[in-house]
């Protein structure tokens, strides 16, 4: 998604009740990470990242601990599933989900698309080749300055760890690398002792499209329904 679209989405997110919307999604990511790689963050990079992202959203420690414990219970029976869909105006949508009931999840997603004229779920794999998967990290400019590093120094230091692109956005620095370089880039930040504000794997459209305000308003109705679903943990489109 392009910056203009992300700005509009960010404005909406500020209005969301984080306790009811964001925290359950973060908790699922923590539970699944602990289930896959163990409950010790020191030896589970995926869990470290999930906890880091939760702390960035001010998720209480008790909630984080509960999510880790849930991995060893029946409640921790989560699976990762990706679904794909199309909407009007050439919009492509990829939805990453974490669910304990795939039947419920796909039924809900189909209902959102069925309520939107011209939109439909498509077979998995239909759209994946139209998105590049990237490792994306965010850090604070002030933390970089505290380490007495220039942006050029930071870029040079992380190139050997898989950095492909460095971008300044406000008071933050965005680092992007290949999908397979996530673990290596994480090690690069750790070697510099540079705190990470947010990290994850994202899908970036190879051929973004632009929508006018009217088209965006109609499309956002569908995207809002999808994002409001507790099973959907990440949503990507080809909108510029």
From Swiss-Prot:
Domain of life: Bacteria
One cellular-component annotation, GO: cytosol
InterPro entries from the UniProt entry: Integrase-like_N, TACO1_YebC-like_2nd/3rd_dom, TACO1_YebC_N, Transcrip_reg_TACO1-like, Transcrip_reg_TACO1-like_dom3, YebC-like
Disulfide-bonded cysteines: none
Keyword annotations from UniProtKB, A to Z: Cytoplasm, DNA-binding, Transcription, Transcription regulation
Family annotation (Gene3D superfamilies): 1.10.10.200, 3.30.70.980
GO BP, sorted A to Z: regulation of DNA-templated transcription
GO molecular function, one term: DNA binding
Subcellular location: Cytoplasm
HAMAP family xrefs: Transcrip_reg_TACO1
Family named by the database record: Belongs to the TACO1 family.
Name recorded for this polypeptide: Probable transcriptional regulatory protein HPP12_0160
């Amino acid at each position: 998604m392009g910056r203009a679209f992300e700005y509009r989405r960010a404005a909406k997110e500020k209005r969301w009740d984080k306790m009811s919307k964001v925290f359950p999604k973060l908790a699922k990511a923590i539970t699944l990470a602990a289930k896959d790689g163990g409950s010790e963050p020191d030896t589970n990079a995926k869990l470290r990242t999930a906890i880091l992202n939760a702390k960035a959203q001010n998720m209480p420690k008790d909630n984080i601990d509960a999510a880790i414990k849930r991995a060893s219970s029946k409640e921790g029976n989560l699976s990762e599933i990706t679904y794909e869909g199309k909407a009007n105006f050439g919009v492509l949508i990829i939805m990453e989900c974490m669910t304990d009931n795939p039947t419920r999840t796909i039924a809900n997603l189909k209902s959102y698309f069925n309520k939107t004229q011209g939109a439909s779920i498509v077979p998995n794999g239909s759209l994946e080749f139209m998105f590049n998967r990237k490792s994306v990290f965010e850090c604070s400019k002030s933390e970089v300055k505290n380490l007495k590093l220039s942006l050029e120094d930071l870029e040079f230091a992380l190139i050997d760890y898989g950095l492909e692109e460095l971008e300044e956005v406000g008071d933050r620095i965005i680092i992007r690398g290949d999908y397979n370089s996530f673990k290596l880039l994480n090690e690069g930040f750790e070697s510099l002792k540079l705190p990470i504000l947010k990290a994850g794997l994202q899908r970036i459209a190879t051929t973004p499209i632009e929508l006018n305000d009217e088209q965006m308003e109609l499309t956002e109705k569908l995207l809002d329904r999808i994002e409001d679903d507790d099973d959907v943990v990440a949503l990507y489109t080809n909108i510029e």
